[in-house]
Amino acid sequence: MIHNVEKTKLEYGDFQTPLELAEKVCEKLVQLGVNPDIIVEPTCGLGNFIEAASYSFTRAKKIFGIEINSNYLDKIKEKQIFLNDEKFDIRCGDFFQVDWSSIIGQLNKEILIIGNLPWVTNSQQGSIDGENLPIKNNFQNYHGLDAITGKSNFDISEWMLIRLVQCLQKHNGYLAMLCKTSVSRKILNYIHSQKLNLAYSATYKIDTRKYFRVNVDACLFLCKFDLISKNYFCDIFDNIETSKYYRIGYHNNVLIKDLVALKRLKNLYTNKSNIKWRSGIKHDCASVMELQKINDTFINGLGEIVDIEETYLFPLIKGSYVAQNKINATDRYILVTQKIIGEPTDNIRDLAPKTWQYLEKHEKLLDTRKSKIYQNKPRFSIFGVGSYSFSPWKIAICGLYKKLEFRLIGKISEKPTIFDDTVYFLSFEDEEIAFKTVALLNSSLARDFYSSLVFWDEKRPIKSSILNSLDLEVLAKVIL
């Protein structure tokens, strides 16, 4: 059981900003010409940001600090700086209950919203039965499978930042927040998708190990707002001190990591690819569906010896194997119960009775899989399967690893190789075509192209949408 204090810190994504870092952030903002009349910190914690801001922004007439943790508020009120200065307005409040429009909307002067919002996702909240969440709604507007297979998991700070951006749309002001770098891009995506006002934005990488003792890719995210500008790009700085940067922005409504590099290679870009990268099989029950072969004996993830027909068993190459080039042999196998999504599975009972008995033995695990993709589907269904899964030749890459290395993979033991759902692949019937294609994909030109698109700090940096954006026909004409 998580101790109550620890649970509270986890629930609120509680990473208190050291005064040293708060001062550096404020100094940077001053260098950039930020000089607000009003300062707001929505989750002020121990008050380090509002303290640093009071020293740096001497013109500020009012500094608001809102905090849900009453223990922190008690400590703030003990600090001498906050005792006798009427410009400070420190309140107890829950971000998700505060009417930010009424607070910010009343202010007709230049505003700075500054701080450090919680670094926690809604799924992490669920794992500890946390309640520090906004009212549930699909604010990212994900559709279909994206909404039900986990893409709708989001950082709490993402929702909070969107709310603050909305409040600043009718103001001249700034937003300066510490957040995960991936969250800053999601906010830029939101602003772009909604065609909101944005005069300028930038991120400055921060040393989270030094300041927070965690290994998280995070940044100072700065946005400048006015009443007319719609500048949907973001300058990326390696740290707060440097003046060197590169610019991310949009091409064909897709966020691009390096606009300059893509401009040089834009003839290779397509949003109507003739080929389609697929992901491997998803089953959400590895302990039953994946087996290890040891001395001609199959063992499942529960440690059980499994005696079944090999009719529905196929060699499995996991994403880590693809990344490490362990592709010519495997001791892992996967039960593939369907050839296409939604195919009836009853025929397994007749074609492979021992396999059916095995599945029924573990029906409780299989029937209680949480994902909605299995609802109202045949028993023991899988996902991410089709005729492409059984092609003899495949070109594969793991979406989780931070390297662009494509592997050509053939059959193993006369059976087509199957991948897990961390792998993306192209399928081929013809070995020669597959061989030529993998050579194209591993060319320096292809790597330069993909490198201009991939954000390596993301959990799954390589995505099918990125892979599909390379026009292989054009690339072949350039190289061959």
From Swiss-Prot:
InterPro entries: N4_N6_ade-DNA_methylase, SAM-dependent_MTases_sf
EC number assigned by the record: 2.1.1.-
UniProt keywords, alphabetically: DNA-binding, Methyltransferase, Restriction system, S-adenosyl-L-methionine, Transferase
Signal sequence coordinates: none
One annotated GO biological process: methylation
Class of this enzyme: transferase
Molecular function per GO: DNA binding; methyltransferase activity
DNA-binding as UniProt keyword: yes
SUPFAM superfamilies noted in UniProt: S-adenosyl-L-methionine-dependent methyltransferases
Transferase listed as a keyword: yes
Family to which this protein belongs: Belongs to the methyltransferase superfamily.
Role summary: A gamma subtype methylase that recognizes the double-stranded sequence 5'-TTCGAA-3', and methylates it on an unknown base to protect it against the NspV endonuclease.
Protein name: Type II methyltransferase M.NspV
